[in-house]
A protein has these predicted regions:
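Residue-level recognition of conserved beta-strand positions in structured domain cores
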Residues: 43, 88-90, 130
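Short beta-strand edge/turn micro-motifs at domain boundaries
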Residues: 85, 105-145
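A short hydrophobic beta-strand element
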Residues: 80-97, 111
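Short beta-strand segments enriched in hydrophobic/aromatic residues
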Residues: 34, 90-94, 132-135
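Short, cysteine-centered beta-strand-loop-beta hairpins and adjacent loop/turn segments enriched
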Residues: 63-67, 92-107, 137-142
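Short, low-complexity N-terminal intrinsically disordered segments enriched in polar/charged residues
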Residues: 1-37
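A broad structural signal for short, well-ordered beta-strand segments within beta-sheet-rich domains
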Residues: 9, 65-67, 72-74, 125-133
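A solvent-exposed, acidic/Ser-Thr-rich amphipathic alpha-helical stretch
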Residues: 27-81
Length: 145
């Protein structure tokens, strides 16, 4: 049995995850925060499993959304040893441009998510095993997804 996860590790993981998404970090930086085998991500666009499918999703969305800002408003962890169920709420704002429209459009949502975080068998670090976008609440004036 390995070391139990801590709230601080999970908070740090969530913070690093959204900072990487904001800057469209190289996908390898995000892979380091995700379990590969056994990983499941439930996006509004559809599910991904493992690093390979995540990379396909990431390549698509980083070519659609820009000027992204993710602001964490809640990270509530229920830790059980080397795994944790985590409620995450993040305010996500971005722009999208649909050619040949003359202007980009603003998007703003509060995203309610559920994560399962585990300790990586390879690195010993806290990583995301399962990531579910439960609900997107649009902000006033937001374009629809």
């Amino acid at each position: 049995m390995g070391e139990a996860l801590t709230k601080e590790e999970i908070d740090d993981l969530a913070d690093r995850w959204y900072k990487a998404l904001d800057v469209h970090a190289p996908v390898e930086e995000l892979h380091a925060m995700l379990l590969d085998e056994g990983n499941e991500m439930m996006w509004p666009e559809g599910p991904t499993h493992g690093h390979k499918e995540f990379t396909g999703w990431y390549d698509r969305v980083t070519r659609i959304f820009f000027d992204e800002v993710h602001t964490l408003t809640k990270v509530d962890s229920k830790i059980d040893g080397e795994s944790a169920d985590v409620e995450v709420v993040v305010n996500w704002q971005a722009k999208v441009w649909n050619p040949p429209e003359p202007n980009s459009k603003w998007l703003g949502f509060d995203a309610y998510q559920t994560w399962e975080v585990v300790r990586s068998p390879d690195t010993g670090q806290a990583v995301i095993k399962r990531y579910v976008v439960d609900k997107l609440d649009p902000m006033p004036g937001s374009t629809e997804l």
